[in-house]
């Protein structure tokens, strides 16, 4: 199974997908979707559109020059089949992929290294130029504290109401017990009178 690259955005074109345009000089152009095909027909430059891999490589956002990338180049030279050669090639492919991923991660970390410092300096400058932002922050903090206090008061009120309800319930239970005892005493007295006659 051969996976081609989109001529415009460099994304993979799997078998049975995409569009192929063949020019008069027999040059093939494969596109992953109609969006790429339309942009190609409009003669747009892929290096100027931010969503293409060509732009990302030209702008230095992705690893563009590396020895691991040369292995993926297309070679139109047929090689005689050799079982050992195929086995070593498959092993090498997985190893090259691991190395490429490590290098891409290192490249990304190196590219993002100064971002936190730059963000901090930008925020510091913003606060220095607009000191009213700090006052807004103080107002937000005061509002949050007021909300927390109100919530705490509500919780304490609910707890006190529950305690009062429990006290009322306990008083009612005691009254019911007393009534039951009185009824039992009356029944015992009646039974005693009946036995006496």
UniProtKB/Swiss-Prot annotation:
Signal peptide: none annotated. The keyword Protease does not apply. Pfam families: Ribosomal_L24e. Disulfide bonds: none annotated. InterPro entries: L24e/L24_sf, Ribosomal_eL24, Ribosomal_eL24-rel_N, Ribosomal_eL24_CS, TRASH_dom. One of its GO terms (biological process) is assembly of large subunit precursor of preribosome. It is found in: Cytoplasm; Nucleus. CDD domains: Ribosomal_L24e_L24. Keywords: Cytoplasm, Nucleus, Ribosome biogenesis. Residues 154-176 have a biased composition (Acidic residues). One of its GO terms (cellular component) is nucleolus. GO terms for molecular function: ATPase activator activity; ATPase binding; structural constituent of ribosome. The keyword Cytoplasm applies. Residues 147-180 are annotated as: Disordered. Belongs to the eukaryotic ribosomal protein eL24 family. Involved in the biogenesis of the 60S ribosomal subunit. Ensures the docking of NOG1 to pre-60S particles. Activates and recruits ATPase AFG2 to cytoplasmic pre-60S ribosomal particles. Associated with nucleolar and cytoplasmic pre-60S particles. At the end of biogenesis it dissociates from cytoplasmic pre-60S particles and is likely to be exchanged for its ribosomal homolog, RPL24. This is Ribosome biogenesis protein RLP24.
């Amino acid at each position: 199974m051969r996976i081609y690259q989109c001529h415009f955005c460099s994304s993979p074109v799997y078998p049975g997908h995409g569009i192929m345009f063949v020019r008069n000089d027999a040059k093939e152009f494969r596109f992953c979707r109609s969006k790429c095909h339309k942009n190609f027909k409009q003669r747009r430059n892929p290096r100027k559109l931010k969503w293409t891999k060509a732009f990302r490589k030209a702008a230095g956002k992705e690893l563009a020059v590396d020895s691991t990338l040369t292995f993926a180049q297309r070679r139109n030279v047929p090689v005689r089949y050799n079982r050992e050669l195929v086995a070593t090639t498959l092993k090498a492919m997985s190893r090259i992929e691991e190395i490429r991923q490590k290098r891409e991660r290192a490249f990304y970390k190196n590219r993002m290294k100064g971002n936190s410092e730059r963000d901090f300096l930008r925020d510091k400058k913003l606060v220095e130029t607009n000191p009213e932002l700090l006052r807004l922050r103080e107002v937000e903090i005061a509002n949050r504290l007021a909300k927390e206090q109100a919530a705490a008061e509500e919780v304490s009120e609910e707890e006190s109401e529950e305690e009062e309800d429990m006290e009322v319930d306990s008083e009612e239970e005691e009254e019911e017990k007393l009534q039951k005892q009185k009824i039992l005493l009356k029944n015992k007295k009646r039974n005693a009178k009946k036995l006496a006659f």
